[in-house]
Amino acid sequence: MLLKNVHADLLQLANEQIAEHSQRFFKTGKGEYGEGDIFLGIRVPVLRKLVKKYRGISIAEVRRLLHSKFHEERLLAVLMLVQLFKSGDE
């Protein structure tokens, strides 16, 4: 199951300083538009590299990522769906 590998990679790449900055940037405080969003602290270019690494991931696993509590896992799922759409035959 690739999903366990994806999650492990993301946890290894997590950066507390970036996560703290992202929480402020995305306004995650009480009553703010991003209230409760949880960040691992991984920049978008790094996530794009993971899209390439996990090109063979199933739609079911991508769907599970979409329901993650972590912002970066959800974003990774969206980036994976975009890649699947681009590589589709129609």
Predicted regions mapped to residue ranges:
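Alpha-helical scaffold domains
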Residues: 1-90
